[in-house]
């Protein structure tokens, strides 16, 4: 169905996180059949289904195409907002100050928790050392310019984001809280799952960037009423969406804090098609 701003049909906006929510398996990028069926049906009915994720576009593209999506996408938690299906939509890219990021990463409390990190822009990546799990989620090897090892002399001064892995025993919430309190004037910090049994990933984006702001833009662009907005997520980087959307849905595998903030907590996990079951019964 073609998008029509003047349409009188009641349409919903489903703003959906990828890892731990829409995807049944982050490593393989698989989608539960129930979720795939429900999303395709919603799109065919004219509803807006938007992916808002910490991933870059290169590792979001296969999912976007598989589901037949046609709406705005938010990558890097909103640092890159674009619509691959609309050549007339002007993309928005927000960059980080590299010097400020390196200052944050040099903090002893932060540095001792980091096991690997990557600095990246829309078409380039520098990764400290190879890691198949991290590379599968972020599609680093698909970047136009990929470099193993961080060469500070050859990094553009304006990356879009930084991602870093932490130790398996890192207290995620404690570190996230520390980053926000200590460096909240320099950037936005979030943490999310990159797959079952794997350590969480942290990311840093420019100040003022979060998923909730992407929802605000999307609802205005498509003329969606606030009452008809639904956010679906499982981790800490999804909380900003919950502050904007009218209905907040989490799968059974979501972090306890996310469940506490949710309007609806599904019985199913992401692996069991939680997103599909909710949309199908909306």
UniProtKB/Swiss-Prot annotation:
PROSITE patterns assigned to the protein according to its UniProt record, in alphabetical order: COF_1 (PS01228), COF_2 (PS01229)
Amino acids binding Mg(2+): 17, 19, 234-235
Enzyme class name: hydrolase
Binding site for phosphate: 18, 53-54, 211, 237
InterPro entries (UniProt xref): Cof (IPR000150), HAD-like_sf (IPR036412), HAD-SF_hydro_IIB (IPR006379), HAD_sf (IPR023214)
Cofactor section: Mg(2+)
Gene3D superfamilies: 3.30.1240.10, HAD superfamily/HAD-like
Keyword tags: Hydrolase, Magnesium, Metal-binding
GO (cellular component) term, any one: cytosol
Residues forming the catalytic site: 17
GO MF terms, alphabetically ordered: magnesium ion binding; phosphatase activity
Enzyme Commission number, as recorded: 3.1.3.-
PANTHER family: HAD SUPERFAMILY HYDROLASE-LIKE, TYPE 3, PHOSPHOSERINE PHOSPHATASE
Family statement: Belongs to the HAD-like hydrolase superfamily. Cof family.
Name of the molecule in the record: Putative phosphatase in upp 3'region
Organism listed in the record: Metamycoplasma hominis
Record lineage: Bacteria, Bacillati, Mycoplasmatota, Mycoplasmoidales, Metamycoplasmataceae
